[in-house]
Amino acid sequence: MKKKFIILLFTLGMLLTPIKSQAYDTNAGFTSMVNNIQIEPLKKEYHLINGHNGMKTFMSYTAITDKTSNQYALQQMAYTDEMGFRKINNRYCVAIGTAFEAPVGQIFNVELDNGEIIPCIVGDIKDDKDTDASNVFTSQGCCLEFIVDIPRLDGIIKTLGDCSSKCDEWNSSCFQYVIYDINYLEKGEDKWNG
């Protein structure tokens, strides 16, 4: 009985995580609160291999031109923030590889080695020919490509080709992806804050 109780506590500990204001987008509309504990519908966690160089590249949102695609539909709902990043509900629109099995519109967080959390939404899927054999990293060692409005993007980011210079907290390698069982396109924009 004692062993079952310990396993139950361990399982509950994995499901219930303390609130961290810097770690969660409180406007995301997909969390539940119980006694100051935040419960989120977790789908998968992916721990990234060591040796990732930390580079976070960018692509122009205007490169998404197929008007029949989910990528295009999502960009019609997105806005450009003051630094040139495309966002939906304070989540960064990004392109990721197929290894994560996350379709366009999927909500996820990227945890960096330094503990910083970047709230993201899948805005595009990297073609397998543009990633390594694991379908995670590009030839530049990037596993997270931000979708941006290039004319509005900060000059230093454009010069370096790396979004890590957005702020000191982002100057760290990606440690893991936490993918939630929520898809913005399936839930619908009108129901997002409900």
Language-model segments: residues:
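Solvent-exposed, well-ordered loop and adjacent helix/strand elements within mature globular domains
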Residues: 24-194
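Sec-dependent N-terminal signal peptides of Gram-positive bacterial secreted proteins and lipoproteins
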Residues: 1-23
